[in-house]
Amino acid sequence: MLKTDLTAPDCLQEGEMGKKLQAKCLGIISAASCVKLYCCYGVIMVLTVAVVALSVTLSVRKKKPVMESCEPCYAVCSSGWIGFGNKCFYFSEDMGNWTFSQSSCIALDAHLALFDSLEELNFLKRYKGASDHWIGLHRESSEHPWIWTDNTEYNNLVLTRGGGECAYLSNRGIYNSSGDIHKKWICNKPNNYTLQRPLIVNPG
């Protein structure tokens, strides 16, 4: 009985210490849990923002037309024709007078070639080879202005040499002579495709 009375305070003391230790442990665990919880909230917020931003980006890209590059932006021409700028050119292997050459071009839904710039003229000179070629420049007489086969007046971008009524392209420039002489010829027609400019594709 005496032994029991002596140990009772010790037991009470040990019980109080256990409660304090338990509370301390719970506090440590609670603090660690809060840190982990905040970390989880932070990760969730970052992921949510990333998903929203990605969704907005994809939505904008879907609505925006896609521009397909066209480099170089030369005309797309049928077989046997050469594209430059927005035109297609045909360089004949046969020979004929100026009138026959123009008729041959018309049969191909084209006309004897005309040029709008020095770049176009230089392209024709490079590509034609060594032979002279009829082009679409002509006049009624030496008293009349030069006109193209589409009836537009020539702007004298390059002077013609000679005393004839029909012009041809040589390695040295533009010359003219009687239209009865047989030469090769160059036809041209506008490009009928849309690929000479960037193609807009609307996503479905």
Curated annotation (Swiss-Prot):
Top-level division of the source organism's lineage: Eukaryota
Domain C-type lectin stretches: 84-188
GO cellular component, one term: plasma membrane
Keyword Cell membrane: yes
InterPro entries on file: C-type_lectin-like, C-type_lectin-like/link_sf, C-type_lectin/matrix_domain, CTDL_fold, NKR-like_CTLD
Keyword annotations of the record: Cell membrane, Disulfide bond, Glycoprotein, Lectin, Membrane, Receptor, Signal-anchor, Transmembrane, Transmembrane helix
A Pfam family that the UniProt record links to this protein: Lectin_C
Molecular function terms from GO: carbohydrate binding
UniProt topological domain (Extracellular) ranges: 60-204
Disulfide cross-links: C77-C88, C105-C187
Segments in the Cytoplasmic topological domain: 1-36
Compartments it resides in: Cell membrane
Name the record gives this protein: C-type lectin domain family 2 member E
